[in-house]
Amino acid sequence: MRIEQELKLGFKDVLFRPKRSTLKSRSQVELTRDFTFKHSGRQWSGTPVIAANMDSVGSFAMAKALSEHGVMTAVHKHYTVADWAEFIKENDASVLKNAMVSTGTSEADFQKTKDIMALTDDLIFICIDIANGYSEHLVQYVEKVRAEFPDKVISAGNVVTGDMVEELILAGADIVKVGIGPGSVCTTRVKTGVGYPQLSAIIECADAAHGLGGRIIGDGGCSCAGDVSKAFGGGADFVMLGGMLAGHEESGGEVIEQDGKTFMKFYGMSSQSAMDKHSGGVAKYRAAEGKTVLLPFRGSVHNTISDILGGVRSTCTYVGAAKLKELTKRTTFIRVQEQENNVFGKE
């Protein structure tokens, strides 16, 4: 047993220190980023925010809506090949280039991914997603997928430390997904005692990935636009959002009427609800590691994503970053014990 004494930080532990800026307006800030990925050599240009691959967030409708903003969606893995064929038939490359095909690591998952990717050349992203990215099986699976798809962009995770980021990149991942337990409907840290504060995880994993020419996704922990900015400031190349994009008409969640009000069900992908729906219940050897909540129906996602991106633009003006790419270089975090004045409630 050993104890690491260094304090690790989450988004609530810091604020940006403002800096002199020549920017006169948020409209001058460029949020689009251009990436060329290490292994595939593929290029992608867009706003590096991703809707999470949860079946009450990462729907086909969400992918279509967010593509209008240049934002990506990691489409959840529970759509069939026939569902994908219909989606591809109805949408052009401008939508498909911003849709990630999510997969697990079983042999059936591998075959399904091959079947989906064979439908069109316009799909370029594969998201290999398991809760515990420290499994040697994941590394082997990444190698297998890379051998099968040498020209596709592969994301793999989830992990929270630099050593595993490096191993996954060397195995063939272009992007590593970072985050264990920070999500709003995730209870992994409570059920297992395992995790890592998300901002420190991003800072450390970004350093490891960038040293090898790889990229990272900060996955989870954002509850407001300021947190999204902090993730980018900490070095995340992409930021993945679940709860912030849940509860919308495009989210794909179950709509429930209660006392004349409309709600949408939102749950973690290791929750009782998810396992009842997709696995026939919680296996005897497992514990559910997610919550199920009812969110007030929030209407169209277009307003929400515009508000989030507006907040990130505003962050950039406060620290003098004319481009999102510059934000991490312009970032100085100060440690704090308070974030906001809640006398009239939380924002």
Swiss-Prot record:
K(+) binds at G181, G183. One of its GO terms (cellular component) is GMP reductase complex. SUPFAM superfamilies: Inosine monophosphate dehydrogenase (IMPDH). One of its GO terms (biological process) is purine nucleotide metabolic process. Keywords: Metal-binding, NADP, Oxidoreductase, Potassium. The keyword NADP applies. The active site is at C186. NADP(+) binds at residues 108-131, 216-239. One of its GO terms (molecular function) is metal ion binding. Its EC number is 1.7.1.7. Catalyzes the irreversible NADPH-dependent deamination of GMP to IMP. It functions in the conversion of nucleobase, nucleoside and nucleotide derivatives of G to A nucleotides, and in maintaining the intracellular balance of A and G nucleotides. Homotetramer. Belongs to the IMPDH/GMPR family. GuaC type 1 subfamily. This is GMP reductase. The gene is guaC.
